[in-house]
Amino acid sequence: AILMVSTTPVLADGHTDTGLTYGPRPAWLISQMDDGALKTRLQACLSQTPTRTDFSIGHRGAPLMFPEHTVESNIAAAQMGAGILECDVTFTKDHELVCRHAQNDLQTTTNILVSDLADTCTKPFTAANGDEDATAECRTSEITLEEYRTLTPKMDAADARAMTAEEYQGGVADYRTTLYST
């Protein structure tokens, strides 16, 4: 679900540390390290019990594992101990506020290019051609809140060598996962 701005207190506020987890990523990253003192030290940390802290900020939620600025991403950040959930704000065509990193990133963070809203993009999809990368630009300010809510969030990425809008939707960075992006 795509996140909207609200005056309601954020998820992390007032919740206890019950059920906090770092998730599988830290253990997996440590397992990929070469054997040595640092790996041994980090492995010892895996048995720690997570606690919520204001020092931990959910920047756009938990965007390494979930599409950024989504309800799911913010819930994951809170469950991993983020005491603060940061929400960048932009506006829709009908002047509603929504959580977005940028005004012009719908082409890389949602399915807009392969939806009925593709025609609203300020720069329609253009396929890669020779040395020129594929391009597109779609802005939150070009669609209404109702239209915005129809979009499906995805990991922030694009395939610069794409020949079709469908291919452009791919290209997820190696440090992110699409495991939870449905």
Residue ranges of model-derived segments:
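Phosphate-group recognition and catalysis centered on beta-loop-alpha active-site segments
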Residues: 9-182
